[in-house]
């Protein structure tokens, strides 16, 4: 049947195998109003069980995970956050921060091994994403620690000085964002075969999580250098711990993943026409990431308070994660519309049904390029018996010899 959105002939099903749009069912059928349209907001491309507007961290930052693994990752994240929060409520903030600092990186390493997408070159991918981000994050935090303490000490009597606010809320976040891009951009230039929008998102998220983890450990060490237990109410420790161990890594991951996805989409071979959607435009991604990095730090310095600071970081992290989710969704739709199909069938890891090996599952609409390497099982089409070659041909039959007068050989 012909897709009304991209105009290509697509196998019958609920979704177009090329552009992922919802197809009308039956002769003269119509698509439900909320399911129509090229944007396909009712079904997120990497996990059609969720809406595009679902606030889901796992399916946004770890798009290759199959459904069962994604559910397990959500439980691990929830339990880890609760454990870190429980430790923080006991006023052991450094321990809670270290526990929270390793939570998302552990999830990433599990994800990296489970999806097996980069099993050909795991060392270089890990080294230039997570490890490079961690080293640069630790270096930046240690390098600026004494400078910030000195600037802060000069203005204790009348609130933060202008120089401290500029350094802490503008220079440091923007410099950190640039450092988070170093590793992924190195991969971009030295490994051009990683040319998929999913590669860009995963590399950016990995670098950001490594950066945030190292930054959190340095912050915890700075607290350990003083008393381990400090005074104050419960929220004096709980909210800062959640901000440092959860919201800040998510903010970094959303910002860096958004930028890297836009960069990788520009050279994706499956997207011949450059996307015109704002969410996938590189200038917009850079501007959104810069605002998301600076705004919460600036508001925290200008309007202090632990609860207010938590709210600023929560809003910034949620906004950047949503933009990264929209950018990935639209990017997968854009590249799918240019994809070419082959004759094999695959088993979709989401709905477990056979579907043509195109850009999207014809049954549930999942972007098959977002499937783990082990998740999509290809089923070869029935093979026709090969033509008999010389080795397989039956032995030739000798022509009958002519007989003599008495039936003997001449």
PLM feature segments, named:
Residues 1-410:
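Hydrophobic alpha-helical segments at protein termini of multi-pass membrane proteins
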């Amino acid at each position: 049947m012909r897709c009304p959105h991209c105009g290509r002939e697509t196998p019958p099903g609920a979704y177009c195998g090329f552009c992922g749009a919802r197809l009308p069912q039956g002769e003269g059928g119509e698509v439900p109003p909320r399911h129509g349209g090229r944007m396909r907001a009712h079904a997120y491309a990497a996990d059609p069980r969720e809406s595009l507007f679902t606030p889901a961290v796992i399916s946004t930052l770890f798009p290759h995970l199959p459904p069962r693994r994604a559910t397990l990752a959500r439980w691990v994240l929830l339990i880890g956050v609760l454990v870190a929060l429980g430790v923080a409520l006991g006023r052991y903030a450094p321990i809670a921060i270290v526990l929270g600092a390793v939570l998302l990186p552990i999830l990433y390493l599990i994800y990296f091994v489970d999806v097996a997408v980069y099993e050909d070159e795991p060392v270089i991918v890990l080294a230039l994403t997570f490890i490079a981000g961690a080293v640069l994050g630790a270096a930046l935090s240690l390098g600026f620690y004494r400078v910030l303490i000195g600037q802060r000490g000069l203005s204790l009597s009348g609130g933060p000085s202008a120089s401290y606010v500029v350094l802490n809320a503008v220079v440091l976040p923007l410099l950190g964002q640039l450092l988070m891009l170093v590793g992924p951009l190195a991969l971009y230039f030295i490994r051009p075969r990683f040319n998929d929008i999913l590669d860009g998102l995963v590399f950016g998220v990995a670098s950001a999580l490594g950066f945030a983890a190292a930054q959190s450990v340095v912050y915890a060490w700075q607290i350990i250098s003083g008393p381990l237990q400090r005074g104050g109410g419960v929220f004096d420790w709980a909210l800062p711990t959640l901000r440092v161990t959860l919201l800040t890594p998510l903010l970094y991951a959303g910002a860096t993943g958004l930028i890297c996805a836009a960069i990788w989409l520009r050279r994706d071979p499956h997207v011949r026409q450059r996307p015109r959607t704002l969410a996938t435009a590189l200038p917009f991604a850079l501007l959104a990431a810069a605002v998301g990095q600076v705004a919460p730090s600036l508001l925290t310095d200008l309007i202090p308070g632990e609860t207010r600071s938590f709210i600023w970081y929560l809003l910034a992290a949620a906004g950047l994660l949503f933009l990264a989710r929209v950018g990935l969704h639209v990017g997968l739709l854009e590249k799918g519309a240019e994809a070419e199909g082959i004759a094999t069938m695959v088993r979709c890891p989401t709905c477990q049904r056979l579907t043509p090996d195109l850009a999207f599952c014809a049954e549930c609409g999942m972007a098959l390029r977002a499937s783990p390497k082990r998740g999509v099982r290809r089923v070869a089409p029935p093979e026709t018996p090969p033509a008999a070659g010389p080795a397989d041909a039956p032995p030739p039959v000798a022509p009958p010899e002519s007989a003599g007068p008495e039936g003997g050989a001449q």
